Amino acid sequence: MRIIRLHHLMLTVWAMACVQLLFGQATVGTLNLTSEANQDYVLFSPNVSESTYLIDKCGRLIHQWETEGRPGMMAYFMDNGDLLRTRVHQTGQFIGGGIGGIIERFDWDGNLVWNDTIASFSHHHHHDIAVLPNGNILAILWEKWFTEDAIARGQLPELASEEVWVTRIVELLPMTGSGSEVVWSWSPWEHLIQDTDPALPHYGDPADYPQRFDVNFQAISASGGSGLGQEA
């Protein structure tokens, strides 16, 4: 109990010192600070900026990276001090919230040490990524399919859209310098159920297969087409 109280007292003193700092000089980003906050650093990449900032809870700038292009939806600080971030890359094929398209890694000095473009006519990275314990990267993509693809999987023609955006999650093995190899992937497109045509694959009663995705369940994508999607 004494240790807990002492720790709380130290946090309170630290927070008070930060408050004095906030009034004494300009800081980067800190608007509110309480004794309940931990002492971890904060990494953020403003949506309209090409800079990424590492600050302490007092708002003091610890480090800054200058990069090219608007950031995607995330930035991560690696154990060795590298910055891993996503970047917006438009191809004109996919337009939606959370769009990314490029994953890049910078060392502490701001040198680009690795990047990968995951954006084409048929697929596009969006939203978050995750670094696995083995160093590989999980990324979430949109895949583009068309009316005939959906109908061939049992979707009713009256429900079929011109484009169908389907989620795919991929595990990427980064190559030296740039690029990656897909070593694993998963998509709901491979786990469908439909009850419209017994001659087509994945026929059955959706109620009997709750682990599968009903191809006739409608979700509207940002483009106005239908989609089987997931945002991280």
Regions found by a protein language model. Give the residues of each.
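N-terminal secretory signal peptides that target proteins for export/translocation
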Residues: 1-6
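Bacterial N-terminal signal peptides
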Residues: 8-21
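Histidine-/acidic-rich catalytic cores in large beta-rich domains
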Residues: 24-232
